[in-house]
């Protein structure tokens, strides 16, 4: 069982690796849209207390997909090797349509299994997080 620490994806917000390789399987931890080395979150405007004023789900989707790709590639895998994606949205009603359209653009060729769930919040002020399984 190998621990994967990406040099391109954002730093984890807790004590966990970006991914674990077990045999030919790669299990990714929850990946959000933050950029490596930055506190700002793409597409998010916060007030002085850190509360969300507004956010752009499309910008966050594109950023989170970029981060997932970084972890996959740093682990020796690639986008086409994704087999399962669990998506966590904090606002299913307002964001699902945009997210689903962008998801389709990224996954037209490789169509992994997918589950999308709405949750109350995520550990940082983000609107989307992905948990993925891939093969190496």
In which residue ranges do the predicted regions lie?
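Short, polar/acidic, helix-capping and beta-turn segments at strand->helix junctions
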Residues: 1-136
């Amino acid at each position: 069982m190998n621990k994967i620490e990406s040099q391109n994806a954002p730093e984890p917000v807790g004590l966990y690796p970006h991914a674990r390789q077990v045999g030919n399987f790669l299990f990714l931890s929850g990946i959000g849209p933050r950029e490596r080395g930055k506190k700002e979150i793409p597409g998010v405007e916060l007030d002085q207390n850190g509360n969300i004023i507004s956010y752009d789900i499309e910008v966050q989707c594109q950023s989170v997909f970029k981060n997932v790709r970084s972890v996959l590639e740093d682990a020796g895998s690639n986008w086409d090797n994704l087999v399962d994606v669990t998506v966590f949205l904090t606002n299913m009603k307002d964001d699902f349509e945009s997210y689903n359209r962008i998801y389709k653009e990224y996954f037209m060729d490789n169509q992994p299994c997918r589950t999308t769930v709405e949750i109350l919040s995520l550990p940082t002020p983000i609107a989307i997080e992905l948990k993925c399984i891939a093969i190496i």
